[in-house]
Amino acid sequence: MGFSQAIRLNLASFSSPSPCDYCLTRVVNHKQKSLVAFPSITRRKRHLLLSVQSVLHNTRPNINDNGSAESANVLFDKLFARTHRLERQTNQHSVYPDDDDLPYSNLGVLESDLEAALVALLKREEDLHDAERKLLSDKNKLNRAKEELEKREKTISEASLKHESLQEELKRANVELASQAREIEELKHKLRERDEERAALQSSLTLKEEELEKMRQEIANRSKEVSMAISEFESKSQLLSKANEVVKRQEGEIYALQRALEEKEEELEISKATKKLEQEKLRETEANLKKQTEEWLIAQDEVNKLKEETVKRLGEANETMEDFMKVKKLLTDVRFELISSREALVFSREQMEEKELLLEKQLEELEEQRKSVLSYMQSLRDAHTEVESERVKLRVVEAKNFALEREISVQKELLEDLREELQKEKPLLELAMHDISVIQDELYKKANAFQVSQNLLQEKESSLVEAKLEIQHLKSEQASLELLLQEKDEELAEARNKLGEVNQEVTELKALMISREDQLMEATEMLKEKDVHLHRIEGELGSSKLKVTEAEMVVERIAELTNRLLMSTTNGQNQNAMRINNEISIDSMQQPLEKPHDDYGMENKRLVMELSFTRENLRMKEMEVLAVQRALTFKDEEINVVMGRLEAKEQELKKLKEETINDSEDLKVLYALAQERVGEKTMGDLAIEMLQLEAANLEVEAATSALQKLAKMSTELLTQADMSIEADTTHTVMPERGYSEGSNECLGEVKTEVVRLWSLTEKLLENAGIVAGTSTCMEGVIL
């Protein structure tokens, strides 16, 4: 009914004046207006069509008229397609106002389609009304049929009650007859059932005994597997120890190779320094030669000028020929000296090139050695990785062993459960045997009871023997655990002693550092004295400069006097002769005066260079002293931190010892409980063994972790000390001999102390039975 009302409402909406007609009249009257209102009208129409279509799709089709429903759906699909086309056309032609007649031609088609759809809807409504009427008539028919069926069921139930009463009476009679027969047969069946129960119990006992034997065999096999795994573990541990020994040997070889490389590098550095000095000397000699060649060229120019003047005045300069010959001899001597100096330069250059070739060869050899050392280091790392993989395998084997032990314990628990079940089933068997013996013979019952009691006594005796053996085994294990605890206590005492030795060595290192500080103070005092000496040298240089200036003034005055004398001469010949004599005398006077002037200039330059060099050395030494002081403070802080860590480790060791003592007391308590429960065969023995093994494993792991932490601390100390020493050595730049020797001695002592610390840590590790991969750390420290 609700469906028909919805359709009627939709039809009423269509019977009202349609928006399409309104739109058409408005467009005819107002063609000059725009089509702005048309999309809203089409949207309303689309909404109405969508509502109609939703109603049509939600309705149920008629039973007899499927074709009409399908035709209505097809019509509405066509309507929707045309409305979509209209919307598209309106959207396309809304921009162009000239094409107004296109959508209105389509609106007429839409109206015809709507009318056809309304006709189809009316037909559909009539069909639905017919279907509702048919459904009501069918319901009435069904109700009538139900009433008739209920009446028939009542009659059938009454007849069945009568039939059941008759059957019950017959059954009672049969039951009475059968009960009498059953009482007779039950007595026979009791004997048979007792016999069958006895056979079933015997078969179940045999099966359970077989299961017990199988479980025992499995336990024996598992114990064999555990022993095999333990033997494999021991063999792998031996292989690991051998591999560690080989690694240590290889580390020693690497250390020797590194020492050789360091020595060669030092030699190369020394040779480079000598090469630099020689190059500087060559440069100085070349500069001197250039100066001499320039002077020689100047002298040659002067000689040529003199020759020209002498050619003009041959008649007057016979006396001066001897002087010119002397000058020529001097020039030839200078020429020979220049040639010899050039040859020496060429020879020194050849020597330098040969030395450079030798140095290049040595560098190539060093690079090859470095490559070999690097390859060797890689092989060592590979060996370490293999060792670690073997350790992982060993841990896996240990885990498997632990799992096998757990399985064995579980199987033993199952065995005990089976034994308890057997003990529970034994009284049932005894009752069955007792009943059978009452039926058959009392003598047979007594004999069976006697055999059962004998079997029980034998089982109890065997259980007592096994309990005694287990108690002895537990006692032996307790003694071994006590010995292990004593050994651990001794190892802890040794570790404490070694820690005391380490502390003593740290104090010794502090004393060494204090002595090195004193040496640094002495070096600073020496540097101050050198500063005073340098100031003195500067004063002397100033006085020498004053003397040079005074000499230059004297030479200038002599030159002025000679010029005045030359101007006073009137005669030409006498003037020329006097000029020649004066020039010769002036040259002879200036030559000895110029030589000391040049010597003073060279000395001044040399002294200035020495002053600058000494100042730079002093600055570098001051920087080195500051760096050493910083390094000392940093090392003191590191030593304090390490001491704090060592104290923390001692506290951890004390805690571990207390825990081991508590574990031993717990083991003793468990052992006492096991002694009290000797008469019963329980899982307490295995629990005690497992607890003992776990306690021992915990002790070993705690000791190994503590020792590994100590080793890490020592390696960190060593690496930090070595890095600080390397930083100090890199900042130093060729100090004087005394100071360099003192610093080298200090470095040697520090390295010896570091090696001692490392040897102590290795001894600790060897005493604890740990084979850790600390060789790589030592390699980094030595490098």
Swiss-Prot record:
Residues 128-309, 345-432, 457-512 form a coiled coil. It is found in: Plastid, Chloroplast. Keywords: Chloroplast, Coiled coil, Plastid, Starch biosynthesis, Transit peptide. The keyword Chloroplast applies. Residues 1-27 form a transit peptide. Disruption phenotype: Displays wild-type growth rate and unchanged starch amounts and distribution in leaves. Starch synthesis, starch degradation rates and starch ultrastructure as in wild-type leaves. No change in starch-metabolizing enzymes activity, including SS1, SS3, branching enzymes, debranching enzymes or phosphorylases. No change in expression of SS4, PTST2 and PTST3. No effect on SS4 localization within chloroplasts. Larger chloroplast starch granules than wild-type. However, in most chloroplasts only one large starch granule is present, in contrast to many in wild-type. The keyword Aminoacyl-tRNA synthetase does not apply. Its main location: plastid. GO terms for cellular component: chloroplast. It comes from the Eukaryota. May be a potential target for increasing starch granule size for indurstrial purposes. Modifying granule size in starch crops has an effect on both the ease of commercial starch preparation and on the final quality of various food and non-food products. Interacts with PTST2; the interaction is essential for the initiation of starch granules biosynthesis in leaf chloroplasts. Interacts with SS4; the interaction is essential for the initiation of starch granules biosynthesis in leaf chloroplasts. Required for the initiation of starch granules biosynthesis in leaf chloroplasts. Involved in determining starch granule number and size in chloroplasts. This is Protein involved in starch initiation 1. The gene is PII1.
